[in-house]
């Protein structure tokens, strides 16, 4: 059977998302490109999900690596930071398409009635490659959100610092060094 033609037009842009994209610094043309790219990526992720439901070994792969959740999380992080599309280029233009291609071929070969030892060896290599790809996607996703994690970590440390009671000792007398400091040093 032939693949169904995709609709050339994208759904209308939600006003909140339009505002988000504009606030991210994207021009009208960049918004169109981003939306088209993300629509293609979403379709690829949906196809990967469908394949994982059809082939038990692929389902096991996704369960062991959290692949589907990882793909969705990376997609969502990219939607939240559309100006960073180039930072996620490997994910968008290489990793997901290559993973999808491997999964489609894997599913096709898995459904063959007769398999030889070479077939099983090839399937094992493909499975190992897909597992490694999932690990690489995880590593790249963690690098993509690292700034967000660093910001959160800084905020948590600051909040903890404000929660701690101030360490003052009422009975402590100022030392000569404290009294003798020029005022400008105490301010800075």
Identify the meaning behind each predicted range.
Residues 62-188:
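Soluble C-terminal extramembrane regulatory/interaction domains of multi-pass membrane proteins
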């Amino acid at each position: 059977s032939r693949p169904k033609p995709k609709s050339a037009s994208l759904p209308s842009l939600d006003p909140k998302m339009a505002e988000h994209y504009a606030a991210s610094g994207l021009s009208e043309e960049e918004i169109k490109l981003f939306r088209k790219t993300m629509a293609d990526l979403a379709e690829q992720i949906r196809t990967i999900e469908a394949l994982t439901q059809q082939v038990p070994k692929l389902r096991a792969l996704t369960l062991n690596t959290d692949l589907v959740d990882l793909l969705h999380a990376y997609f969502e992080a990219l939607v939240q930071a559309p100006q960073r599309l180039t930072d996620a280029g490997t994910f968008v233009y290489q990793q997901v398409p290559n993973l999808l291609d491997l999964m489609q071929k894997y599913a096709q070969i898995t459904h063959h009635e007769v398999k030889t030892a070479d077939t099983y060896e090839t399937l094992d290599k493909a499975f190992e490659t897909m597992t490694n790809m999932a690990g690489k996607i995880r590593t790249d996703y963690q690098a993509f959100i690292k700034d967000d994690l660093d910001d959160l970590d800084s905020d948590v440390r600051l909040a903890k610092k404000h929660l701690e009671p101030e360490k003052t000792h009422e009975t402590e007398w100022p030392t000569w060094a404290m009294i003798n400091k020029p005022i400008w040093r105490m301010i800075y």
